[in-house]
Structure formats: structure tokens, C-alpha cells
């Protein structure tokens, strides 16, 4: 396979012997071999237990009966990354110098949700896993006297993590059993409502004093961490297993509400895409300091 990496760096003085800068940028892309298909499809890793007839039957039911496009056969994906760094160094005077550094990262990759040999998932059942991170650090070093020196350091980091289904979120996770094997379509049940954001701050002051043959150190530091974590499985509907019964639904059944479907024994579970099973959430928050 081929991995593409592009980048550059540049640096030099802004003010001679006083102020300097450095910057670097890099982007990369590498393939992820995710393609899969039915027997004889010549698309990635074929599933010998899945015939073209059954594949087309499931796809046509989704499109014609539920007005949902499952995305077709999945192709290979990619992982892309973008990152850059900026740095400034300042020689304030003979006693003091400062450094500021900024780092940025943005990466995403396409992943399969259920990719075992006994599983096949349409393309819209895949999901994109990504993260965006920013970090800023500031450092000030001081030599007050021959005996006394100090350092101040501050760092701030934010990170946004994402897991987003490749297709529409408003169609529940469907599992169609073919013997002991399974076909998946719809939004993966664990990627329908996800959010993870963190923000951390770190501050430190340290000093050192030479007292004769002794070295006295002192300092203070504080770290805070805020976390927001949301994971709502089945936010747009849970996992539903069916196959032949999906063809047997009458037109009248398709118009019933979710509750009506469960209460009416003459109806199958073919209207699952309309289900709203509530949106509970779990949120975590934490902070600490010392």
C-alpha cells in the first residue's frame, strides 16, 4: 500500500539574538482495508455465506419498503492526519527567557463496526473515529541572582473526540440473521449519540536557592481537568433482528406507532426506523487540583 506524507518546517530569527520562531506542518494519509462483499462480488473480503440474491433482497427491502439507502458495498477507507506546531523563543534579557509553543492535531479514520468473518455490514453502518487536540504551553525562566533561579510553566490542552456513523443517524441498527451469520445496516447502535470533550490546565511555579553547600527548592503547582462524556447507546433505536417477516408487513402496519407495533401481534418490526426510544445520557464531570 502507499502512505502519503507531506510536510515542511521553517524557522529563524525575528530579531537577531533576541526573538526566534520555528514552525512545522505535516499531513498524512494511509489506506484502511475495509472493503467487503457478497460471494462473487470481487469487492474486498468476500463473505461466502452471503449470496448476491440475499444481498440484493435486503438492499431492495431497505430502499423500497423503508425508503432507506444502506450505502451499498463498503469500499476501502483511509486514515488522515493533519498537525502543525508553532514555537517562539524570546531572550528577554540576560536574566530572563520565555518560550511559547502551540500544537494542533486533527485526525480521522473510517472504521467498521462489525467486521468479523460471520458478519457483513453495508457502508452506512461504518463510522468515522476522529479527534481534534490543541495544546498551548508557556514557560518563563529567570535567574534573579547567582543563587536564586525560578521557572513558571503553564499548559492548556483541549481535546474533542468523535465517533460519527457514516450514514444517517435516524435509522436504527438492523441485524438480519442468515443462519448463524449476520448482515448489518442502519446506524451502529453504539455510534448514534457520542461526545467526549476534555479540557485540562496545568500551572507550576518552581524555584531554587543555593545556600552555601545546600540547595533549597520550593514551588507550587495546580492541575484542573474537566471532562464531558456522553454515550447513549440505542439513541435512535436498538438492535433489531429480523429477516423474512419484514416482507410480510401489510401497508396498514407500516403506519402504526412504535407502541402499536409491539402490541399488534399481526405486525412485524418493519417500522423500526421511526422508533424513538428516548435519549438518556450519562455525563461525567471532574476537576482536581493540588
Regions found by a protein language model. Name each.
Residues 1-132, 144-146, 158-160, 173-177:
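Acidic, glycine-rich flexible loop segments
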Amino acid at each position: 500500500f502507499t502512505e502519503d506524507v507531506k510536510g515542511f518546517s521553517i524557522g529563524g530569527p525575528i530579531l537577531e539574538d533576541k526573538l526566534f520562531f520555528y514552525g512545522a506542518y505535516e499531513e498524512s494519509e494511509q489506506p484502511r482495508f475495509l472493503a467487503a462483499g457478497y460471494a462473487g462480488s470481487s469487492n474486498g473480503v468476500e463473505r461466502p455465506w452471503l449470496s448476491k440474491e440475499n444481498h440484493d433482497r435486503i438492499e431492495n427491502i431497505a430502499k423500497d419498503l423503508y425508503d432507506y439507502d444502506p450505502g451499498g458495498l463498503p469500499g476501502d477507507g483511509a486514515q488522515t492526519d493533519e498537525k502543525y506546531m508553532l514555537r517562539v523563543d524570546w531572550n528577554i534579557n540576560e536574566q530572563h527567557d520565555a518560550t511559547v509553543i502551540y500544537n494542533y492535531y486533527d485526525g480521522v479514520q473510517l472504521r467498521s463496526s462489525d467486521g468479523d468473518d460471520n458478519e457483513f455490514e453495508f457502508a452506512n453502518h461504518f463510522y468515522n473515529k476522529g479527534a481534534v487536540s490543541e495544546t498551548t504551553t508557556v514557560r518563563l525562566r529567570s535567574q534573579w541572582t547567582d543563587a536564586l533561579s525560578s521557572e513558571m510553566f503553564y499548559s492548556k490542552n483541549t481535546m474533542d473526540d468523535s465517533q460519527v456513523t457514516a450514514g444517517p443517524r435516524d435509522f436504527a441498527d438492523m441485524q438480519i440473521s442468515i443462519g448463524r451469520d449476520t448482515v448489518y445496516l442502519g446506524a451502529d447502535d453504539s455510534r448514534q449519540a457520542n461526545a467526549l470533550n476534555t479540557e485540562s490546565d496545568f500551572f507550576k511555579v518552581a524555584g531554587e536557592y543555593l545556600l552555601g553547600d545546600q540547595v533549597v527548592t520550593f514551588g507550587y503547582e495546580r492541575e484542573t481537568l474537566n471532562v464531558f462524556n456522553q454515550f447513549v447507546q440505542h439513541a435512535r433505536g436498538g438492535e433489531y433482528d429480523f429477516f423474512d417477516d419484514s416482507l410480510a408487513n401489510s401497508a396498514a402496519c407500516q403506519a402504526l406507532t412504535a407502541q402499536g407495533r409491539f402490541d399488534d401481534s399481526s405486525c412485524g418490526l418493519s417500522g423500526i426506523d421511526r422508533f424513538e426510544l428516548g435519549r438518556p445520557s450519562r455525563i461525567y464531570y471532574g476537576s482536581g487540583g493540588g
